């Protein structure tokens, strides 16, 4: 699995940040202003201590204005002492309090604006990640999914994206705010006492090292939890799809036991993750307290020394500023914990996003033209990884003709059909439509030539109308009804509660097998493709349903070029050519009568089905 280093993590996040650069800039500006007003508000404590309560008896004189801290500090003290002399200490205290309130208002106001500008980035990144992940899943070729569990893919799209949203995106604000606050505060600490600050910076990395060790362990356990969650979701998906088989074989206890074992392993891993995560706050608080204690001791030594340049009030201000670093540092530590927790999910997401689709669109595609002549397989060979599935296939399918593919399971029938719309690409040879190699067309144009009706009708949890119009834009109600009538589906559709607006349930679960198949045929009729692919479309139906579906198929096949995969040989007697496949090769071909006379594999299959 792809490992995401710290640099790769930053690059990965930057891929999604592009549209939100304005938000990032505004957030940084607001955080800087918030930090500035924070320093200013706390700086008011020093004159209160040193002048108002006469910690120092010093006379200040006005200095010509210059952009340096000594001049600014001297002139601030000058105005305050003058105000005390003219208006008294009580009014001065009130004025300083007003300044403190105003500074705090601007500090909190800019802090809110920083969050206000970063929230669209945070929510937008998650939305964009979901969109890109879904688009990638739709765009990837079928070979990718043959190596992945469906439940694991669903976990990446739902659980992992949710984890990234919870762990990483919730930390974006802390990552954008706290480093700025910490750097500005540390700069202020250097100004107050560079010796004390250098000592602090020697102590802090030790705390960071301890936190980092725990965070690394957290990331590892989080990855285990996500992988186990994918296994759990896979079993749930398989259980829901195979309940009939589970009950028929009295396997309820077995699958429940297996699920419980998966669930227990997930529970143990999540327990370890949460324990490590909950360690972050008390550990950071303890280390922060230890650091403050060390600063108090070392700072006290500096103040008590005779040559100290730090006053007691400056040290108190130093402690206040240092204490204000603790909270951003703790939040930053928590953010890093969250990121370590979410990076495991980000790695799993990026594995899909970075998956390479071997089906490449040609740079200068051949423009689509009406299908007028023939489909040709020329010396076509294909393999899954190292195993050859098709070997040296040659086949010509003239326009308007029906060609049937028969043979035992695993002989290569479905693979041969899948190569035509480029669900996979041939390894050797070529497939052409009207003499044009299918690889030189856009996938959209190529697949626009074709309509599919499969053994298992693929329907969606939507209305009858939307299932029939799937992939066909701007279809009218009259066109949909006409397609349904041709497919022998209109009558049962109108008998439903809301007719064409009736929801058919998950995968068309509210319909019978024959009804689902007829909706699938209606969808193909509405698309009106010149090339039709029928994959064992009636093999799983009862006699009455098969009759209705077969009649609908005959209506669909009129004047169309048709490729049929069938196990029931009685349905393809009228095919213009029947190709018998065995171990990836076409071993017999001809009409039904020709193949019976040949007395080969086809006749054996036909005789077995006639018994």
Show which residues each predicted segment covers.
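Membrane-integrated ABC transporters
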Residues: 1-43, 50-100, 106, 114-118, ...
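Juxtamembrane helix-loop junctions of ABC transporter transmembrane domains
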Residues: 2, 6, 37-46, 50, ...
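An intracellular "coupling" helix at the cytosolic face of ABC transporter transmembrane type-1 domains
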Residues: 16-22, 142-143, 159-168, 172, ...
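Transmembrane helices of ABC transporter permease
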Residues: 23-36, 173-224, 297-310, 327
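Hydrophobic alpha-helical transmembrane bundles that constitute the permease/transmembrane domains
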Residues: 28, 32-40, 101-112, 164-167, ...
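Conserved catalytic Walker-motif region of ABC-type ATPase nucleotide-binding domains
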Residues: 137, 259, 377
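Helix-loop-helix
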Residues: 188-202, 276-347, 352-353
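ABC-type nucleotide-binding domain
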Residues: 361-362, 368-611
């Amino acid at each position: 699995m792809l490992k995401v280093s710290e640099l790769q993590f930053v690059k990965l996040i930057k891929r999604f940040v592009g549209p939100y650069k304005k938000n990032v800039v505004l957030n940084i500006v607001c955080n800087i202003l918030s930090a500035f007003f924070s320093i200013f508000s706390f700086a008011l404590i020093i004159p209160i201590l040193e002048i108002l309560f006469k910690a120092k008896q010093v006379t200040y004189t006005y200095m010509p204005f210059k952009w340096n801290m000594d001049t600014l500090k001297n002139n601030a003290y000058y105005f305050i002492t003058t105000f005390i002399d003219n208006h008294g200490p009580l009014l001065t205290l009130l004025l300083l309090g007003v300044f403190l309130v105003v500074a705090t208002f601007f500090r909190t106001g800019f802090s809110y604006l920083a969050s206000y500008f970063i929230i669209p980035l945070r929510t937008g990144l998650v939305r964009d990640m979901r969109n890109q992940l879904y688009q990638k899943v739709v765009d990837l070729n079928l070979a990718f999914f043959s190596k992945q569990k469906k439940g694991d893919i669903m976990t990446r799209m739902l659980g992992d994206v949710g984890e990234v949203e919870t762990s990483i995106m919730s930390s974006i604000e802390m990552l954008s705010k706290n480093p700025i606050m910490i750097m500005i505060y540390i700069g202020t600490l250097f100004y107050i006492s560079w010796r004390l600050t250098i000592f602090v910076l020697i102590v802090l990395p030790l705390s960071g090292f301890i936190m980092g060790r725990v965070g690394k362990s957290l990331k590892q356990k989080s990855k285990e939890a996500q992988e186990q969650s994918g296994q759990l979701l896979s079993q749930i998906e398989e259980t829901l799809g195979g309940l009939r088989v589970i009950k028929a074989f009295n396997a309820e206890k077995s699958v429940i036991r297996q699920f419980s074992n998966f669930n227990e392993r997930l529970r143990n891993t999540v327990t370890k993750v949460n324990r490590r995560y909950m360690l972050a706050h008390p550990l950071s608080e303890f280390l922060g307290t230890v650091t403050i204690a060390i600063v108090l001791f070392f700072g006290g030594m500096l103040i008590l020394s005779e040559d100290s340049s730090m006053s007691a009030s400056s040290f108190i201000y130093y402690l206040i500023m240092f204490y204000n670093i603790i909270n951003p540092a703790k939040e930053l530590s928590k953010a890093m914990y969250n990121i370590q927790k979410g990076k495991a999910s980000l790695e799993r997401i990026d594995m899909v996003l970075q998956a390479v689709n071997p089906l490449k669109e040609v740079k200068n595609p051949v423009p689509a033209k009406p299908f007028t002549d023939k489909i040709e397989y020329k010396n076509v060979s294909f393999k899954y990884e190292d195993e050859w599935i098709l070997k040296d296939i040659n086949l010509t399918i003239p326009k308007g003709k029906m060609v049937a593919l028969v043979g035992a399971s695993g002989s290569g029938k479905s693979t041969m059909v899948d190569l035509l719309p480029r669900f996979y690409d041939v390894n050797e040879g070529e497939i052409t439509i009207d003499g044009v190699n299918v690889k030189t067309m856009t996938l959209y144009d190529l697949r626009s030539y074709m309509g599919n009706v499969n053994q298992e009708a693929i329907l969606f949890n939507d209305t009858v109308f939307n299932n029939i119009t799937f992939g066909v834009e701007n279809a009218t109600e009259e066109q949909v009804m006409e397609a349904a009538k041709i497919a022998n589906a209109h009558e049962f559709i109108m008998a439903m509660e809301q007719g064409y607006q009736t929801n058919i349930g998950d995968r068309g679960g509210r319909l019978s097998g024959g009804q689902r198949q007829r909706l699938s045929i209606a969808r193909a009729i509405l698309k009106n493709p010149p090339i039709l692919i029928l994959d064992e479309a009636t093999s799983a139906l009862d006699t009455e349903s098969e009759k209705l579906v077969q009649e609908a198929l005959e209506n669909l096949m009129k004047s169309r070029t048709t490729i049929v995969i069938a196990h029931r040989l009685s349905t393809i007697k009228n095919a213009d050519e029947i190709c018998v496949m065995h171990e990836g090769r076409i071993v017999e071909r001809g009409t039904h009568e020709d193949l019976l006379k040949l007395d080969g594999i086809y006749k054996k299959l036909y005789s077995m089905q006639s018994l």
